[in-house]
Design a protein with these regions (language model features):
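Beta-strand-connecting loop/turn residues
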Residues: 12, 52-54, 73-74
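A short, surface-exposed loop/turn module that caps and links secondary-structure elements
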Residues: 33-58
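Amphipathic alpha-helical recognition patches that constitute DNA-binding helices
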Residues: 15, 19, 55
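Enriched for short, Lys/Arg-rich terminal
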Residues: 1-9, 17-18, 26-29, 43, ...
Length: 107
């Protein structure tokens, strides 16, 4: 991979980065360590949801997930998610963010 970047909303907020900063430090370190493994193409537990939308799954906390896409060999972290109860809503929001990238509204 060439790199990893955070999806940025038009208002400048970065959902995944903001979520990481709000986590307990020990949990944040574990999640960031896992994200860094992606540089070596070690995705660990992940699932392809659609042709260009993936779910990085964690066994930490409430079963956290990070939805991401790959654009030009760069991982774009779109959205974090907590538990399964709102998973379909989270996936729809991640798809919206992905469509924004595709439409060059936000990259």
């Amino acid at each position: 991979m060439k790199g990893i970047k955070f999806y940025k909303l038009p208002n400048g907020k970065e959902p995944v980065k903001d979520w990481l900063l709000d986590l307990d430090k020990s949990l944040r370190v574990k999640i960031i360590s896992r994200i860094e493994l992606i540089y070596d193409d070690n995705f660990g537990d992940y699932k392809k949801l659609y042709s260009d939308l993936y779910e990085l799954r964690f066994t930490l906390g409430k079963g956290y997930r990070i939805y991401y896409t790959i654009q030009n060999d760069v991982i774009v972290l779109l959205l974090n998610a907590g538990d399964k109860s709102k998973q379909s809503k989270d996936i729809e929001l991640a798809k919206t963010y992905l469509n924004n990238i595709k439409d060059n509204k936000n990259d």
